């Protein structure tokens, strides 16, 4: 044996640098420990608290499973990292609890709100809102690539329309342009297929999608575009309902592509072609970035852009 006290053995195995003991004794203690298959105990790190600020109310989140999926992914990923996540719906606190280690903000926030959040001087990451101009980290969807995928499909059609929605920031102070609409419009202009009269904007709901397509059918009649890009699946499903009510065949007469690949997209009839957004990646990558900030491992401000994928189903021609 090493002929030392239990306390000395413990301090050597815990690598206590303040302990005054010879190298030979240290080596002997480690040799004996290894022969006994000693494994150093891993200290459990204390749970760190994260504040998740949601731009929606709880009811609005129930109506929009896109943002619900992001939040749930963050909570599940947080458990694996010993993070305790508290969600505040549709509000920004005036002050923070001292033990809050970082903040994640989901949704769309005005410049004033971003400034308000930055004043807490805590690690801060925005999900689904590019805040590079405000010098804040963010994780967003790559809309450029998504629209390229839609355009590759739209190229098969001569007449093309768009059904979209308008959003405002959580405090209602800024109206936000939808990048899907702007990018799609620019791409159609470049291809010579842009028709301003075939672009319709309402809200991001099934009811709005149905109303917008009703309007398009009324205004265009037999010249109704043969292809519509819809800014989310809810709009596309509402549009499909309108077409079916008017006895207009999908996709034989009109093809539709949605956005997000929500859970219901595959179950409507015909099953909806859509751009798939990895909401789990948005949530988990956002949380990873926040933890990196909390650990001091990130230097410059970052925006991480998540790729999308076109899921072809029965609402577009083969």
Show where each model-derived region lies.
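Short, solvent-exposed amphipathic alpha-helices that sit
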Residues: 65-80, 172-194, 208-212, 238-242, ...
């Amino acid at each position: 044996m090493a002929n030392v006290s239990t306390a000395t053995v413990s301090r050597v195995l815990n690598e206590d640098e303040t302990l005054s003991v010879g190298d030979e004794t240290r080596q002997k203690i480690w040799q004996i420990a290894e022969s006994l298959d000693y494994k150093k105990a891993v200290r459990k790190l204390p749970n760190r608290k994260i504040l998740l600020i949601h731009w929606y109310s709880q009811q609005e989140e129930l109506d929009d499973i896109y943002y619900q999926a992001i939040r749930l992914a963050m909570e599940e990923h947080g458990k694996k990292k010993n993070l305790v996540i508290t969600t505040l719906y549709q509000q920004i606190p005036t002050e923070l609890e001292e033990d809050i280690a970082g903040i994640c903000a989901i949704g769309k926030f005005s410049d004033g709100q971003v400034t308000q959040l930055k004043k807490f001087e805590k690690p801060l990451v925005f999900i689904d809102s590019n805040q590079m101009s405000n010098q804040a980290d963010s994780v967003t969807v790559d809309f450029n690539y998504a629209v390229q995928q839609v355009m590759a499909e739209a190229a098969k059609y001569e007449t093309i329309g768009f059904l979209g929605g308008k959003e405002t920031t959580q405090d209602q102070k800024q109206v936000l342009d939808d990048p899907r609409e702007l990018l799609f419009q620019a791409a159609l202009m470049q291809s010579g297929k842009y028709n301003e009269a075939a672009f319709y904007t309402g809200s991001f709901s099934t009811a709005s999608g149905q109303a917008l397509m009703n309007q398009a059918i009324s205004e265009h009649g037999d010249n109704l575009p043969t292809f519509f890009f819809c800014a989310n699946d809810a709009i596309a499903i509402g549009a499909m309902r309108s077409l079916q009510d008017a006895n207009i065949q999908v996709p034989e007469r009109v093809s539709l592509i949605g956005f997000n690949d929500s859970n219901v997209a595959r179950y409507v009839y015909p099953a909806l072609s859509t751009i798939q957004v990895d909401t789990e990646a948005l949530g988990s990558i956002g949380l990873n970035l926040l933890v990196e900030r909390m650990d001091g491992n990130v230097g410059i401000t970052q925006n991480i852009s998540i790729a999308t994928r076109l899921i072809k189903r029965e609402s577009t021609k083969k």
